[in-house]
Amino acid sequence: MIMNLVTNSHILSRRFSSIVALLLMILVDTGCAERQVPSAIALSGSVSSSDESIMEGVVVILQPLNSPVLIAVTSDAAGQFQFNRDRLAAGEYRVSVRAAGYELQGAKTVVIGETQSQRLGELYLTAVTDPLRLASQLTSLDWVNSFPGSEAQKDLLVKNMVNCGFCHSLERVARSGYTAESLVKVIQRMHTYETDHASADRIQVVSKPKPIEGLHWYGRKASDIAEYLATVNLSDGKSQWDYPLKTLPRPFGEGTNATVTVYPIPRQPSVIHDLDVDSKGNVWYGNTGWDFIGKLDPRTGEFSEWSTPNFLPEPEEGLMRIVGVQDIQVDETDTVWVAVMGNKHASFSPDTETWQTYDLPVIWKNPFLGPVRVGEDGLWATGITSMPDGPIRHEHAFRFDIKTGEVGSGIMLFDDKPFPTDPKRVDQLNYCYMMDQDAQGNFLCTAPEASSIARSDREGNVRLVPTPTPNAYPRRGYRDDNNHFWFTEFFADNVASIDLDTDKITEYQLQPRYISPYYARPDSTGKIWISSTGSDRLLRLDPETGKVVKYLMPVEYDARKVVVDNSADRITVWLPNKNQGQLIRVEVTN
């Protein structure tokens, strides 16, 4: 009745409205449970240690006792942390922390109520002094910084198309006892794995071992890499490392203002290379370790999955047929475009749960797809049209009309272009990695070994725009609303943009060395989000000031893509955690 009176208060006198308001106040004061307003803060606390009375940048992690999902926040400059109620359901949670060099003593749990704010109190951390225990807390970048050796030696380890950290942490390398001779054999074995579709827990053996003599790892001498690794691991009977273990600084300032939620997918072990978000906020991902796509509804935490077609031929005896999906792109109708294996395009309709496939005039298709934004109807992809002639691969770009299903004429990309000339590598090739389109719908892609952005008009006039930094290895990125394509320079530790109206490239230096940026994605405010391979940090660049904010994830992560959820009510970024089979949501809270 009271709600009805209030709703129709425009026909009541002011005096009677005042009486209604007074009645409402009395009801609230009586403490009726059904009318209690839940506190916006579900849990708060502080962090300190024997070394620091106030600890900023400690990642505090909660995990429900009945769920694998992780929810994490980071302590601020006052050592305080808080979890908002809209991200914590009532129930019991395990409490853990991430702060290299420190640990939380004993098991700790907390019960979150339905309405009242809970104060966890002080989390008191103790310093880790045992190097063997500290080693398990280091990121791969921490290991690179700790390893002795010259810049050239560390470049051997990190600056490769595929490096050790792409499938597992460098802790595994550092703890190994392999000699240089044995490590060459390890590299030989790992060369038989399909790197994008594999992790340490999900391995696909797709090629036969190459001869040890003259073995290279993506253009580098395998023997040089092995000899260096044998100087930093536990070979020769060592029980501890003969160098100090170094850790990166903890997050600070704006880097503490995020809530991170980690969703392990149900099918494990899996590999998640790419994802995208539809107009409703659902997260679609390709399972790169198996022939499945999946969907997460973040509102309910519910997962769904569907099997995918695979058009690769059967392999020769003793080898595995590559399975798994890489790129995912969702168009404005929420149709899901999927980079299935083989030489075809494939789309999935969420409404009918059916697949449609389209032929492409290629014998091999690049496992990435160009984005299709609202108002765009061209899906760009590349593929090899005939058997390569040595290093000439006959890679062509094709525009696919997602509305009509028509495939445009192929654009020859590199056959008449000079070969890359990085003096530190052999057997270099011209090829496209990540493709996109300019505001007019014309093709572009990153050409990593040519250290260029390849561009073409509809008539097939191709030009290479070189990066200002030579041999920078441009990797993946995305075009913003101002017709600038943002991309990472993996070897140069830069993020860059090319003005697609003028071809001018602007570079922004990232720190520290070997931060290894992989994917760059602009958000609606003009900030650029960058995934980093090996640091477990997500970066945010402000191009106007050059300021970079770093957010530490609660888990080891390797994200090959960054997606901004434009349907969310706050800046929200999604990451596919390749090697752990997880989806990570990062929400900026301030």
Language model features with spans:
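Conserved beta-strand positions in repeat-built beta-propeller and related beta-rich domains
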Residues: V283-G289, D331, V336-G342, A381-I392, ...
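Extracellular beta-sheet/turn segments enriched in Thr/Pro/Gly and aliphatic residues
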Residues: R35-Q36, V111-Q137
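The canonical Cys-X-X-Cys-His
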Residues: N160-E171
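Structural motif
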Residues: A42-E56, L88
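Short, acidic Ser/Thr/Gly-rich low-complexity loop/linker segments typical of extracellular
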Residues: L65-Q82
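A short, solvent-exposed loop/turn motif at the edges and junctions
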Residues: P68, A90-T109
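Beta-rich, blade/repeat-based domains predominating
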Residues: Q268-D278, L312-D331, I363-E376, P418-A439, ...
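Blade-level signature of beta-propeller repeat domains, shared across WD40, Kelch, NHL, RCC1
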Residues: L552-N590
